[in-house]
Amino acid sequence: MSNVTPKLVWPEDDYVDESLLEDHQGPARLEYDALVMLANLPPLTEEIMSRCPALPVKTRSTPEYTLVLDLDETLVHCSLTPLDNATMVFPVVFQNITYQVYVRLRPHLRTFLSRMAKTFEIIIFTASKKVYANKLCDILDPRKNHIRHRLFREHCVCVFGNYVKDLTILGRDPSKTMILDNAVQSFAYQLDNGIPIESWFHDRNDTELLKLCSFLEAIPTLGRDVREILRHKYRLRDHIPFYSIIHQQEGPGRLPLLEVAPPPVTEPNDEQLITQVVQKHPQLVQG
């Protein structure tokens, strides 16, 4: 049973007039953990920077631009406990134990993958284990019409217990590479290549993927560095005034890990969080 790949019956998404959709803006605010992670991000080690690319070189038929996609809470929501309205269930064997994985698909995923594959080299890059993610990709794209490559947890860099997706492992032109992920800290080393998206769990009225289609399809026609476009659109650095300060610190003189207190029960906004860090660590804003 564990070797059988279930056939996916795609759910019918409600029709949405794209012309009426608002422009995609990403999350309204960054999570507290993401702010702390980005403020403390250490430089990549020489060992990591000298890694060989995990992907084969492009062929002539490979699209010029690359779109890296996260899986969990970006394209799907999965659980080992039963989910209401699960689209499918599939078995995964891990350490000789069979688990049933319940899957919900984010609305408009099929349309998104189909359209993006016409314009981009699609790569799945997930912090999940290969035994689970590989099987899920086989179900989502059994004929490999959309997803060209897959990278998993072993391809991530572990930083303070977080799995970070260093895009240099792709061996692709950074000026033509983007990553879509619900966790900003996942692309912390290439912040300007990132497209942040709200985490998805169950909302059947979600249109985030559909909002992105026209925007992404237009990018290759502009002939510009994608980092300039995404930096201007999402302005992630505006949320993190410490980002450039921290990245100027290298070697023994680097600032120590910030011991930022956890947020109170009523979560503060980004400005309040930043004020908390500055008050506790004034050296960050000195000279």
Swiss-Prot record:
SUPFAM superfamilies: HAD-like (SSF56784). It comes from the Eukaryota. The keyword Hydrolase applies. Keywords: Hydrolase, Protein phosphatase. It is an enzyme of class 3 (hydrolase). One of its GO terms (molecular function) is phosphoprotein phosphatase activity. CDD domains: HAD_FCP1-like. Residues 60-219 form the FCP1 homology domain. It holds the Pfam family NIF. Its EC number is 3.1.3.-. Transmembrane segments: none annotated. Probable phosphatase. NCBIfam families: HIF-SF_euk. Belongs to the CTDSPL2 family. This is CTD small phosphatase-like protein 3. It comes from Caenorhabditis elegans.
